[in-house]
Amino acid sequence: MVFRIASSPYTHNQRQTSRIMLLVLIAALPGIAAQTWFFGWGTLFQIVLAAITALVAEAIVLRLRKQSVASHLQDYSALLTGLLLAVSIPPLAPWWMVVLGTGFAIIIAKQLYGGLGQNPFNPAMIGYVVLLISFPVQMTSWLPPYEIAATTPDILDTLRMIFSGHTASGGDMTLLRIGIDGISQATPLDTFKTSLRAGHSVEQIMQYPIYSGALAGVGWQWVNLAWLVGGVFLLWQKAIRWHIPVSFLLTLALCAALGWLFSPATLASPQLHLLSGATMLGAFFILTDPVTASTTNRGRLIFGALAGVLVWLIRSFGGYPDGVAFAVLLANITVPLIDYYTRPRVYGHRKG
């Protein structure tokens, strides 16, 4: 009798993987719709560009590795990576940026490590950080939500901006970022950080148009609530577990509340942290990546809490206004250590 010995993983269920990935793609629809509503058609165009790039890059690498292209593409993981990167970048970012970032995410951050299940870092966030460090101006050039925008590009001008950098009338990103008050706009978190550095008080900052009549910034609170709806859907479908998003959001809220309590003149409120930036997207769609997150329940709680602390620290004291991507990657580094100390011991073995 011949015994065949194979390396791990010892169980394979591609159908289950593709089902979970498909559920995540479906759950992303409310967030995509909200971002498109408030920031224009560019969100959809970036998603299409990222999806095409992800599929092509994955297919090329699989062909070079002499693996089945069709079966691997049907797990939807490449599409999800492209989607997460596309919704994280400004909707009018140049086309080559999303292509570069997605290609880097798939080829370097995923396939170079061996493909799905082998990568230690979240590929989409690796691609995002590479773009943010390399092209900080373009990666922070978000349009103001349509409610406070002085100029809103139509679908054709959106395409022109992405592929040429100008509208039909010759307008550029500088013009499109002008708000109704005649001042160039930024995201709520970016506005808060840069205004504090300029010596403005929190009370003055909250009078800016980007915060008018909103808990956490015009448009952004609804975008985050839309991603929250998608996250609840994933929990309902048991596609993700509650431990990471709950511990992440509770820790972020606790840190923000304590900071705001002791220094309300210099630190953002809990609602600004929870409902601005990529908070809900990170909580339910990025941190919960089963490949790069902790694999035990206690470990997931620690992993989520660590990410929450890191997001608050980066937003409050770091050089970047959001910090979700950096927090995710830093938390990914700790996963082997977290799993080592939280994995249940084998029955019959003493603690060593």
UniProtKB/Swiss-Prot annotation:
Role summary: Part of a membrane-bound complex that couples electron transfer with translocation of ions across the membrane. Required to maintain the reduced state of SoxR.
Assembly description: The complex is composed of six subunits: RsxA, RsxB, RsxC, RsxD, RsxE and RsxG.
Annotated EC: 7.-.-.-
Cofactor: FMN
Pfam families: NQR2_RnfD_RnfE
GO BP term (any one): electron transport chain
Membrane-spanning intervals of the chain: 20-40, 42-62, 69-91, 123-143, 215-235, 242-262, 267-287, 301-321, 322-342
Keywords on record: Cell inner membrane, Cell membrane, Electron transport, Flavoprotein, FMN, Membrane, Phosphoprotein, Translocase, Transmembrane, Transmembrane helix, Transport
One CC-aspect GO term: plasma membrane
Topology with respect to the bilayer: Multi-pass membrane protein
Protein name per Swiss-Prot or TrEMBL: Ion-translocating oxidoreductase complex subunit D
Top EC category: translocase
Principal localisation: membrane
